[in-house]
Amino acid sequence: MGIRTTVVGSWWIHADNEQDLARHFAGTLTPAESEALLIRAATKAIAEQRDLGLDDWSGGEYHTDNFICHLHRHLTGLEIIRPAESTISDYDDITVARVVGKIDAPKGLGYADAYKREKDLPGGVRKANVAGPLDVPIAALFSDMEAVKKQVPGLISLVNRELRGIADAGCPVVQLDAAVEGQFVNAGFMTAQHAADAIAACFEGVKAKKALHVCNGTLRGRPSVGALRCAPWVEILQRLDGVIDIALVEVKYFSQYQEREVFKALPNSMTLAAGIVDEACYWIEPVKKIRERIGDWARVVGEERLWVSTSCGFNRHPSRNIPVLRQKVENMVEAARTL
């Protein structure tokens, strides 16, 4: 029996698009130039993912900069304290802001616009993502956390609006990327119940298959928390029984692999998409090792409820890394098909 394969969302950036995407995020392209660039990049990403044999694919998330480092540009209610470094190397290089009013995105966060732009490209788009309510104000999250916390209900409404927009436009799978929420639970900053309540509210009224992605962060291969665990996330997922259809979970670290038995408590209503293959590791995981890992996870949740995925972060890589990333995906697909 073959195991279904997917990716988290972002796809690698090709050399012929690197400079143009940098200009897009710098705001030096015209709207027409940006639109043409994003269509060109997404078209290539969709074709590549399909050619590699993935069962589910995205538009590549080329409208995003380092996952969420661009989102302050869509928001009102923030004042920039320190702009991002010209080259983002670590978490202290991203934009820093403070809250000065109601945080909102009158023109949207860009995710629904991206899906509408990409859905009719050759091959279409099988899944689309939106950042979680604590991920959206990342520029102010650590510099003005108490002020951000007071606006969580409004941030949930903002994210919900974006998710519903994607679903209403016809996307088969709508995914919430609750990276910060997952990290806060791992670090003890948030309870599983608190995280689950926020996630469930984000999906209120969303008429599509619902996926949730949780991870420990990755920026140039670096996690953002020290507790590289996955077991605490099961407590979140148990509270989302009947809400979430697919749990796309980072399990690439050996410490997470050792906690796999906890996932026997995953609700029967959910599929587990196990993020086994590590995009950040310079080593190309052999087919044999990936197959062994898939088998071990299948013994926990059952083959019929298991998908396999890479970890998130493809679009944080320079184009010179593409041969390694591509081989990782090829090996994952082969391992999943030959289990």
What are these regions (language model features)?
Residues M1-L339:
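Domain-level signal for soluble alpha/beta catalytic cores
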